[in-house]
Amino acid sequence: MPPASATKVLAIHRVPPPPPTGTTNDQAAGVGTTIVTSFRVFPALPFRARWIARITEFEWNHFFADVQEKGPFKDWHHRHDFLAQTRDGVTGTLVHDVIDYEVGFGFAGVIANSLLVRRQMEGTFAERQQRLAQLLAQQY
């Protein structure tokens, strides 16, 4: 990943997945900010789900955390950490996501998480990391 300040990474990190997978309302930053996202649960199908999250913690250039207020999960807590890191003598920013979630729906949710949800989320976050690297590379 190209070297970048936490400020630049934080600004770009708020970019949602590209349509048609997901869209996000314009976002301000700070505690209490509500983020509304529309996304396809199954990308091959036209059905969209709405996800409402609220930022509960925020420290500029260091981290922010959000919780789901309404959406596909029984429980969702997500923390985005922006950590200064030096590699090969170049200082940049490492983005680290910590996610604690519960699918719900009892045993069926456990099965769905094992077969689909976890892999889909891993793919979404891997795509976000790739997009972040691409967008930052365009800045340099």
Predicted regions and their residues:
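Amphipathic alpha-helical segments
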Residues: 1-5
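Beta-strand/loop substructures that line and gate deep hydrophobic ligand-binding cavities in soluble
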Residues: 65-123
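Residue-level signal for well-ordered alpha-helical scaffold segments within enzymatic catalytic domains
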Residues: 110, 134-135
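A non-catalytic, amphipathic alpha-helix used as a structural packing/dimerization or gating element
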Residues: 123-131
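Glycine-rich portal/gate segments that line the openings of hydrophobic small-molecule binding cavities
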Residues: 8-69, 135-140
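A structure-centric signal for secondary-structure junctions around beta-strands
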Residues: 6, 52, 90-92
